[in-house]
Amino acid sequence: MMRCMQSPEVHPAAAGDAEPPTHSTFAVSRWRRGELMLSPDEVAEEVPVALVYNGISHAVMLATPADLEDFALGFSLSEGIVTRASDVYDIEIDTREHGIAVQLEIASEAFMRLKDRRRSLAGRTGCGLCGTESLEQVMRLPAPVRSDASFHTDVIQAAFVQLQLRQELQQHTGATHAAAWLRADGHVSLVREDVGRHNALDKLAGALASSGEDISSGAVLVTSRASYEMVLKTAAIGAGVLAAVSAPTALAVRLAEQASITLAGFVRAGAHVVYAHPQRLQHEASLA
């Protein structure tokens, strides 16, 4: 379910493998209350990131150049390139002049499946849902999630306050999405940011896969709308709750129903809307 660009030709950077910055400062003209001011402004970086499996480039996407190991692992899991984290043997980050190549060494069985997918796409042009060869694969139905998660709605709402305070790149630039993991005890234990909401969730998925967190009892929080792809990636994580600050799409609601995922949107202080499987969210008030 990835959206990616055509792969550009990249050349090793002469300056070495220094990690790119996540944001840069620009001189801007700022108009406020009838006055024009010149001031510095922090702007989020996005760079082409190529995911290379066993030496073969599979996809190139624009992403924030941070937590790329998490991104590569989470993307590989959520896209079904590997079925478990242990199928990824090694991840190396190769910074180049025109982007970043993430080199992944994966199990031979997973690589053979990936090559079969690539052969089915040979000769096609354009890149909408790259790596997806049929409508049936786009609309794949994951197995129902088994989760014993249970949260009071006050905990979910308070967690978004925690998340807002921990979005460092967003505070600098105002341009990034975040995905976070909420533990059963109400603590936001992991936060990942990116200019793309799908990328942020893939980064969280990768971090969770190597963290030892109890997936069955936690929840995914996102600072974006809840699209079909966000629900699908939540199902790949195995989480039973997805809470978003914005609305879901109708397709996302239908998928959440089928995948047994509690889907909440418009989460605010003192308010939220539950679209699917409300049994995992507890509150004192009775239905009006």
UniProtKB/Swiss-Prot annotation:
Residues 1-23 are annotated as: Disordered. One of its GO terms (cellular component) is cytoplasm. It is found in: Cytoplasm. Coiled coil: none annotated. It comes from Cupriavidus necator (strain ATCC 17699 / DSM 428 / KCTC 22496 / NCIMB 10442 / H16 / Stanier 337). It comes from the Bacteria. SUPFAM superfamilies: Cytidine deaminase-like (SSF53927). Gene3D superfamilies: 3.10.20.10, Cytidine Deaminase, domain 2 (3.40.140.10). This is Sulfur carrier protein FdhD. Required for formate dehydrogenase (FDH) activity. Acts as a sulfur carrier protein that transfers sulfur from IscS to the molybdenum cofactor prior to its insertion into FDH. The gene is fdhD. Belongs to the FdhD family. Keywords: Cytoplasm, Molybdenum cofactor biosynthesis. The active site is at residue 127. Transmembrane segments: none annotated. Induction: Induced by formate. One of its GO terms (molecular function) is sulfur carrier activity. The lineage of its organism: Bacteria, Pseudomonadati, Pseudomonadota, Betaproteobacteria, Burkholderiales. GO terms for biological process: Mo-molybdopterin cofactor biosynthetic process.
